[in-house]
Amino acid sequence: MESQRSFLLIGLAMVSFLLWQQWQVDYGPQPAQPVESQQTTGSDAPNSNGDVPIATPTNKSALPTQSVVGKVISVTTDTLQLSINTVGGDVISANLLKYPLEQGSQGTYSLLRPSGPTIFVAQSGLVGTNGIDKGSRPTYSVSQDSFVMEGDSLTVPLTYTAKSGLLVTKEFIFSKNSHEVKVNYHVENTSSDVKSVKQFGQLKQSTADQGGSMFMPTYRGGAFSTEDERYEKYSFDDMQDKNLNQVTPAGWTAMIEHYFVSAWVPPQDQTNSLYSKMTQNGNAIIGFIGQSVDIEPGQSVDIQSSLYLGPKDQDTLEKIARGLDLTVDYGFLWWISKYLFAFLQFIHSLIGNWGFSIILITIVVKGAMYPLTKAQYESMAKMRALKPKMDALKERYGDDKQKMQQAMMEMYKKDKVNPMGGCFPLLLQMPIFLALYWVLLESVELRHANFIFWITDLSVKDPYFVLPILTGLSMYLLQKLQPMTMTDPMQQKIMQFMPVAMSLFFFIFPAGLVLYWLISNIITLIQAKIIYASMEKRGLKTK
């Protein structure tokens, strides 16, 4: 029985640590909001040619000698508000219009930011032998300073005429109710020579600390996908140690943060080069370079890619590219979590409230686990019934551990008791519970999700700490219901203090998680009462 108690204590400690780790992801301070700017200059601006993935020409006189000032155009759709610099045609800011910065606030979540210590921009262009971004960034022409979507789609064209004879129209194509932006290059060759270009797309983000926890840093970094690896994180430290260099059919690259993702998806029917690098001023870059495209004299081609700027919506991401939905990081239990999330989504589609959906899925999961819970309690009861015999064996054999162990095994065999019978059911249940925790922590659907009364956001802590206090009380009642047979005073004190310690943790956990734990404890209390009543009828001791 003592070993089972120790196992439960270790398991609870592991869950607490994992919850604390994931809480850091939830509560990392939001990045500073950008100041509106109509032009971008300086070495930190996204028009710096040093960011372009292909090496600059050996003729140093061809390099830009000063920063180029670009005009910033505004694009507004039903989901996005973007700023695009005409130098390079880079997306230098992106606000997600359907995602408030804070619940009830007028400000929207800023995913891309143009400058300063939190710079995060999406760059793209044409490199290769005749690429217009090869020696310096092109300055595009545009017909107007702002574009607003009025129908189901919007196309924003930027044009550039190169001295080499290439006429380039860079189009940003938006669709209603979508966070995916199609980036299309229409390239016409007016010269008498064959021209060769390669498309690139990359994300540049500052690696500077943005106020994460002193205990556990928030994961904010790169990720990529290849034919062999559907999803692989590539952190800023990884980029610092070694540049990413992968050649793969299809693939994609991304920068990830909690609830949101920015990703470049190149053509999926060609081979692409994925890369990363660190700039001298501490910015991380991850991106792709497409295949070389030859353009015959008098001919034109279209070269397209996709830029996703939005929430980690699994259904949407799965349709855009293979493995992109895995940026919703459920950890090593993702293969369980994805089915639990699908079930949670189904319940929500029926009742329309995420809080009640959490309650219902907890009831279903605990109900499905009831046979295991019953086996666990009955095994523990059988072990308690053997305690007098175990005490007698300890008194008989004293310090002779070998004989003591042999005698105990014979006793277990004779009484048909599995000493680990109380642990195995718990081992089977723990992955289910942990997987559901990841779902509640990682799913953007719970961000700013209302429940009832004072709980208006399930992704943040209970403002009045009602749920944590009730959860601590439920843990105390569970502890009283389950007799403590351990004799070690230190273990007894630790177990007695556990409800208080967990309540303190729950004070800072998201309300959705605490709600899940509270309902789980209440159901466990009810199940324990039923199981104990059944055991008493069969003559098994429950205390």
From Swiss-Prot:
Keywords: Cell inner membrane, Cell membrane, Chaperone, Membrane, Protein transport, Transmembrane, Transmembrane helix, Transport. It is a multi-pass membrane protein. GO terms for molecular function: membrane insertase activity. It is found in: Cell inner membrane. Residues 35-61 have a biased composition (Polar residues). GO terms for cellular component: plasma membrane. Signal peptide: none annotated. Required for the insertion and/or proper folding and/or complex formation of integral membrane proteins into the membrane. Involved in integration of membrane proteins that insert both dependently and independently of the Sec translocase complex, as well as at least some lipoproteins. Aids folding of multispanning membrane proteins. PANTHER family: CYTOCHROME C OXIDASE ASSEMBLY PROTEIN COX18, MITOCHONDRIAL, OXA1. Belongs to the OXA1/ALB3/YidC family. Type 1 subfamily. This is Membrane protein insertase YidC. It comes from Pseudoalteromonas atlantica (strain T6c / ATCC BAA-1087). The lineage of its organism: Bacteria, Pseudomonadati, Pseudomonadota, Gammaproteobacteria, Alteromonadales.
